[in-house]
């Protein structure tokens, strides 16, 4: 919307992998002349700033990574029949605690800066408090399949009636004078393809996924053409923290790939380098290289099933094999497999023989490649971040009248 300048407050969830999908829309907002500020925890002081955005630090004393790691150390927990899985309940409890820690910070920021629009990850339960404090619309920014709405277990503000919310969350909203609602957001921006979604999303705005996986100095080998077919192996940024490296069969995948005439590239965080097994000839490791830098040169990718990895590969038309350990990423992989552009194997089924069969199909199928190309076309057909920025400006302008 020409001539209307917005202040937009973005509030990502407590992980870089949830921040990255927001960055292209932030860039589009900035290049359209709008002001952008990010409210994030201390991890953002490097991740957010390196993406070119300014930020305000919130909830300094709460460590979501430690919360998830504590759950993993505790081990399996039995739940009653029909109750949400323990991991899901842990997620909800942790997000309520995060909201309680972040509430005063985001409300103070919203009152001082007066954003015209608040764009937040739907996980962030303090975001409606900020929107209410600024009298601004709240827009949810999704990152993958809408698991909060489509899981069947319910999540506050994403289809769950307020009488089902945790009592501490209702008390928090009452303290800040914010009415709890079944739907907290007026609309949802969705970079996950509608054809791969798991449920209907009210007032959905489709957004073209544009890969952003951070920045770094690249080794020249990453940009050099591959001498033979290149297969990328990656297990994302949160798997080790949340589930442990045993959730991804690194050694078995490397062994299986080595039986084919391919170049194997493992993309890992520097902190995970020590988890890489002894590698055969023809396999290399690159550390802290953004996936969007190396993915275009790859002929296939084997990964843990994260939504960001799936969509980055989809954007470049790369065939995929997802080996997924938990229900959330298993859902992502199942939706990918339904397009024909990839193969899904659940971790508990990932025997050496099953991996060998899946890898052989990935590298020899005459159907997966064309399906991956078609999926890329579907991604590129979605509205650009610039187009979505214009829609958000109309939304904000209408609410201010």
Model-derived regions: residue spans:
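Donor-nucleotide binding loops and adjacent catalytic segments primarily
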Residues: 4, 207-300
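A nucleotide-sugar donor-handling region in carbohydrate enzymes
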Residues: 41, 163-239, 269-273
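Conserved nucleotide-sugar donor-interacting segment of glycosyltransferase catalytic cores
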Residues: 90-171
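Phosphate/nucleotide-donor binding subsite
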Residues: 54-113
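Alpha-helix C-terminal capping/helix-to-coil transition sites in glycosyltransferase folds
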Residues: 112-114, 184, 296-297
